[in-house]
Amino acid sequence: MGRSNPVSLFNPFALSTFGFSSIGWIITFAGCIATNTQNNGFPKFAWWAVVFQLLLLIVIVVLYITNTFHYHRFFLTCAIGVAFVYNSNATNNLVYDTSSAPAAASAGFIIQCIVNILWLFYFGSEPSSPIISYIDSFGSSENVMLSSKRSKSNRNAAGQSQIPLDEPYKDETMGYAERNSVSNDNSGLHENPFNTQNYTAQLSGLENASTTNRASALPEDDYPITVRGLFDYDASPDDINELSFKKGDIFRVKDTVGNWWQGKNSKGEIGMCPSNYLEVIG
């Protein structure tokens, strides 16, 4: 469960919107310089809008490269909202000027406002939203927020020691075998050592007891929460405790604590599932 799945650095939505915003910022910066040299009435506060948008672009680049959007989602959404207000105010102060320099600056501010609205909608919405899923479908089908959260889950899971699901049953089975071993030692003097009938019967009883205990230890009431798969997930072949599922599959989980949830599908298969691939529906 500690596999690394880094975010793709070629998300079309992220790259295209960042490219438009960068072009808009360059146009704005050049237009503001030209307007300031030609007109003494240039609104000074527009410079702060230019600087704030530049800082926002730098922050987005850092979060995108380090794949840490999930940690700073609310801060990023608020910062984009502030940048939208600053750019709108600067646009209002420049758009009514008929000269070319203020017109260029206001055009750059308008481009940045449009991109900021798209970012507000994308980062402020839940990744499971149908519209957001549609936007992500044009690229790697990987939402940058989900990918960041999934990487966090994988890092946490890699640093934790995991107890296999079969451990309780293994202890119980070993105890059963030890009791039978003691019994056989006491009665070995009176039985034929080459008679394998009793040994075979003990093994059959042991297997039946293990299967019965497993079924009785996992009643349906232990999985009260219904979830649905947001994306396809293939269990690691190196970890028998993971559970595979497809997008749209509905099954039940034991609880929603931590980054990995213990689930049980309709076939009765039990395993651990990454929480960021699931949506609680009941």
Curated annotation (Swiss-Prot):
Which keywords does UniProt give here? Cell membrane, Membrane, SH3 domain, Stress response, Transmembrane, Transmembrane helix
What is this entry's stated membrane topology?
Multi-pass membrane protein
Concerning Pfam families, the annotation shows:
SH3_1
Q: What does this protein do?
A: Plasma membrane osmosensor that activates the high osmolarity glycerol (HOG) MAPK signaling pathway in response to high osmolarity.
Question: Self-association or partners: how does it assemble?
Answer: Forms homooligomers.
Record-linked InterPro entries: SH3-like_dom_sf, SH3_domain, Sho1_SH3
Q: Give all residue intervals belonging to the SH3 domain.
A: 222-282
Write out the topological domains of type Extracellular: 34-44, 97-102
The protein's name in its UniProt record: High osmolarity signaling protein SHO1
Query: Which cell locations does it reside in?
Result: Cell membrane
This entry carries the following GO cellular component terms, namely: plasma membrane
Protein encoded by which gene:
SHO1
Q: Which family does it belong to?
A: Belongs to the SHO1 family.
